[in-house]
Regions:
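Short acidic alpha-helix initiation/capping motifs at coil-to-helix transition points
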Residues: 190-194
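A short glycine-threonine-serine/GTX helix/turn-capping micro-motif
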Residues: 184-189
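Sec-dependent N-terminal signal peptides
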Residues: 8-15
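Anionic-ligand binding patches
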Residues: 154
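Extended, subdomain-level signal for the structured scaffold at the beginning of enzyme domains
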Residues: 2-7, 19, 23-133, 141-145, ...
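NAD(P)-dependent dehydrogenases' Rossmann-like dinucleotide-binding region
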Residues: 159
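The feature captures the short pre-catalytic strand/loop hairpin that immediately precedes
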Residues: 173-183
Length: 235
């Protein structure tokens, strides 16, 4: 009797283990494992622009099987802005491993940020190690300050275009574009353009239909043409 019970328990354990192994294999084949997600590190500072962060965060953040969002700043702790939207961040120097990609927003804080050598150094280091680098609005001024955009195409907020361009005189600035791709670097125009760029990034990685489906889910009219910014004459 005891031996039969033992055999039954062994059989059940074997079947359970086989089932778990099969589920894990299926999860991996579907790309749903944590190991297959890309970490996007948002590099923040005080006086960041709200939608520069939360627009792309809404798009990438809802795709939990593909992207993981983390938030960092030089000092760590809470960063905020003129809209009084606080975000809890981790300290950049405490980063355990390099992220797959970074996103640098714009905002009034970039005016001080371009003079912050430590911030620029951290952005440069992370940009060099990341597979992709995204900037929104005047965030491209911070990236330009690193020198990594020299001889590359880029764009920025049209209302602050002249100031941003002055931060990278060797950059090939495109005033007409909604967003620009040059290698691993994605730079967008102002504020809401970060959402268009994020959807463009999804289209590049997962296909246009996937990006359109994501835009539809958030009830957003995606400006699909990256070469045509309707706000190009704003400045």
């Amino acid at each position: 009797m005891y031996r039969k019970l033992q055999l039954h328990l062994t059989l059940i354990a074997t079947l359970l283990l086989a089932g778990i192994t099969t589920l894990k294999a299926q999860g991996k084949s579907m790309g749903n494992t944590k190991e297959n997600t890309m970490e996007i590190a948002f590099i923040l500072f005080n006086d960041y622009e709200t939608l520069d962060v939360f627009g792309p965060a809404e798009i990438f953040g809802r795709l939990v099987n593909k992207y993981t969002l983390t938030f960092y700043s030089l000092e760590g702790g809470v960063v905020s802005n003129r809209h009084r939207v606080p975000i809890m961040t981790q300290k950049l120097e405490d980063m355990d491993k390099k992220p797959d990609m970074i996103l640098v927003p714009g905002g009034l804080g970039t005016r001080k940020g371009v003079e912050n050598k430590e911030l620029i150094s951290q952005i440069k280091e992370l940009s060099l190690s990341s597979k992709y680098v995204l900037t929104v609005c005047t965030g491209s001024a911070l990236l330009a300050k690193t020198g990594l955009l020299d001889n590359k195409k880029a764009t920025s907020n049209k209302r602050a275009f002249s100031w941003v361009a002055s931060q990278g005189l060797e950059v090939d600035w495109d005033k007409k574009a909604r967003w620009v791709i040059d290698g691993k670097y994605y730079t967008s125009s102002g504020v809401s353009a970060g959402m268009d760029m994020a959807l463009g990034f999804l289209a590049d990685r997962h296909g246009i239909d996937f990006a359109r489906k994501t835009a539809k889910e958030i009830e957003y009219n995606w400006a699909e043409d990256k070469n045509n910014d309707t706000f190009q004459a704003v400045e």
